[in-house]
């Protein structure tokens, strides 16, 4: 993929992160949004849902609203505002205020982008016609994430998704991910009764079942035989 295409894909995915935030804020108006970047595999957005709890069972309704909103988004409108004006707009969101304080200086102008009725603090990098290209996306999972990646901060809810320019690209990505899950050693170990994990001994320390211990011993013997043949 060319550098230009990479940039376009980043813009598409970041734009879809905006769309995700818009849908979440409409469904959960008490939630507080934080950041939503594009990443190598798609995008994510972190939220503080307060007393509300969401899981992957909530993703279909969020995605459904995203598709509905996307049809109404004709573009991303850039608004250049003073630091004070942006602080006033996001005064009820301590996460945005923290970001504003970090990236603002005396007399500096910040940018807020708007699509439809949704506005978000953002430096830019979006698609030009969201209602035409924000079509081929999928919300994938929900996870916990500390604000700013610091375990001393509050645990937020991170929603992951991915987006492409065509249905074929999206289908191919989802197929590859599904096949990878089938071959996940943690999944296979559990299903084949080879080993398990326990938080009591550490997440990276497998506990072998008798069957798993036998397989490991046979593999070790096989490797030793190969090494002896090469000596």
Give a label for each model feature.
Residues 1-11, 23, 28, 32-38, ...:
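Auxiliary tRNA-acceptor-end handling modules of aminoacyl-tRNA synthetases
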